Regions:
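Alpha/beta-hydrolase-fold enzymes
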Residues: 1-51
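Active-site nucleophile elbow and catalytic-triad environment of alpha/beta-hydrolase enzymes
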Residues: 60-76
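Conserved alpha/beta-hydrolase "acid-adjacent" motif
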Residues: 72, 93-101
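Short, conserved loop/helix-junction motifs that constitute active-site signature segments
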Residues: 77-81, 106-110
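Short beta-strand/loop motif that positions the catalytic acidic residue
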Residues: 80, 86-88
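Acidic beta-to-alpha connecting loop that harbors the catalytic carboxylate
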Residues: 90-92, 119-120
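Catalytic active-site module of serine/aspartate enzymes centered on a nucleophile-bearing elbow/loop
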Residues: 109-150
């Protein structure tokens, strides 16, 4: 990595980062469904990691992750005045619901609502945040509740 002053992407480090991200943002069920055999799993991993390495800059990745290192919204949650939905899925490994953080903190937001989407074949761990077919109805509900005069 050379302190970020590299001339070639540090493939070994990026491959390790890909592995961690893959495990943290997916779900075992979906991974098994996509690649039910060891051979399919290895092919999928090789393809995914090589694609990741080709399109990811190590410095950008470090910057993005470091930017959230000390992020803590809790002290200002009570200042949120609008209708607010916090949506999570039961299989989220990055924000595991069993820690109870959203259960506790949503109470600080006057118009806050915590929605925990149960595990299903449609959820995919933390990656569920990119699947509006799972949470789109809640977005529609929030938009309607946010209309003037509602």
């Amino acid at each position: 990595w050379k302190g970020g002053d590299y001339t070639e992407e540090p493939a070994t480090g990026l491959r390790g980062a890909y592995t961690s991200m893959m495990w943290m943002t997916s779900s075992p069920y979906n991974m098994q469904k996509r690649s039910p055999t060891r051979e399919q799993s290895e092919r999928g991993y090789d393809f995914g990691s090589e694609n990741f390495i080709k399109h990811q800059d190590a410095n950008d990745m470090i910057y993005a992750f470091d930017a959230s290192r000390f992020y803590n919204p809790e002290p200002k949650l009570s200042t949120i005045k609008c209708t607010f939905y916090a949506v999570n899925s039961a299989d989220d490994e990055c924000n595991p619901p069993e820690l109870g953080i959203l259960d506790r903190d949503i109470k600080l937001i006057p118009k806050g609502r915590y929605i925990l989407i149960p595990w299903s074949e449609k959820t995919s761990g933390h990656g569920t945040h990119s699947n509006p077919t799972v949470w789109g109805d809640y977005l529609k509900e929030l938009m309607e509740a946010s209309e003037p005069g509602h």
